[in-house]
Amino acid sequence: MSQNTSVGIVTPQKIPFEMPLVLENGKTLPRFDLMIETYGELNAEKNNAVLICHALSGNHHVAGKHSAEDKYTGWWDNMVGPGKPIDTERFFVVGLNNLGGCDGSSGPLSINPETGREYGADFPMVTVKDWVKSQAALADYLGIEQWAAVVGGSLGGMQALQWAISYPERVRHALVIASAPKLSTQNIAFNDVARQAILTDPDFNEGHYRSHNTVPARGLRIARMMGHITYLAEDGLGKKFGRDLRSNGYQYGYSVEFEVESYLRYQGDKFVGRFDANTYLLMTKALDYFDPAADFGNSLTRAVQDVQAKFFVASFSTDWRFAPERSHELVKALIAAQKSVQYIEVKSAHGHDAFLMEDEAYMRAVTAYMNNVDKDCRL
């Protein structure tokens, strides 16, 4: 399906918002930019718009290529495009880079209008609520009163849930994939270790490393390597690499010997080349802070009591970072609140990263659900 169809060459757009944005922590961004990409056409009724919310290291480039020479397509190209589960022949699809990101939206790499210098570590902490608030401003800009669906995996799924809670009248369907209604203690611990790798890098320079012409590459590399391990399933990792060595025998040293070591270092190096350390810190804290039930006496059922959206919730059998049990919490709360919810647990060997992959059962389920979303657009 995905190999024969594509949205083709796409061009990002930077949307300026000359308005203040008051953040959850009480600070204010005097203005902000959001980098977006759109695919498909908004219909005359403006009721076929789908918002794609990205995970920790994602961005606005969801599908297609920026040029014919690009080696890689967007991060969810197998999901979004003509004839794909989120069909751009039927839906107007919007992808964006969230506030605090490093791919064109306002973030640590942006110029602070009050100082004329890069924000760096001075960019304020942002939360999932803040992202959804900025995304609502984007919807207003695009003339979209209500999303046909808000879709996201992992941290993106948290945004889809928050949309349904914060703006119940503006979301008809929420697709929450490989996500959770809040992070587990273990996940918070993983994030802290990753941040410590960055914060203690001698080249971090209190977050103003660019003004010192340095990059905390070692810390960011280690953070990514550790994070990447948690996105994979143990059995899948074992089948892919086993105990395979890069040479014929042990070297009895600390150089790269096992193939899995080589793979992780490659992933770390690649990440350092495309991502910003301050953004990584911000994104992981947004994950930690997400807990919509906290505003409702720690009751998730009360948190979703006023949602109007219908829900599609998906988890993956070997995802131990966002285990199926975490999706069950959301499903049970929605049922207790008498909301519409469809749930699927996909058997997969790929751990948390399965939400990015082209599993047949997973793709069929999303396709079937999006067919219903399309029918709602035609009522």
Curated annotation (Swiss-Prot):
Transfers a succinyl group from succinyl-CoA to L-homoserine, forming succinyl-L-homoserine. It comes from the Bacteria. Keywords: Acyltransferase, Amino-acid biosynthesis, Cytoplasm, Methionine biosynthesis, Transferase. InterPro entries: AB_hydrolase_1 (IPR000073), AB_hydrolase_fold (IPR029058), HAT_MetX-like (IPR008220). Homodimer. Gene3D superfamilies: 1.10.1740.110, alpha/beta hydrolase. Pathway: Amino-acid biosynthesis; L-methionine biosynthesis via de novo pathway; O-succinyl-L-homoserine from L-homoserine: step 1/1. It is found in: Cytoplasm. One of its GO terms (molecular function) is homoserine O-acetyltransferase activity. Residues 48-357 form the AB hydrolase-1 domain. It comes from Neisseria gonorrhoeae. Belongs to the AB hydrolase superfamily. MetX family. This is Homoserine O-succinyltransferase. One of its GO terms (biological process) is homoserine metabolic process. Activity increases in the presence of MetW. It catalyses: L-homoserine + succinyl-CoA = O-succinyl-L-homoserine + CoA.
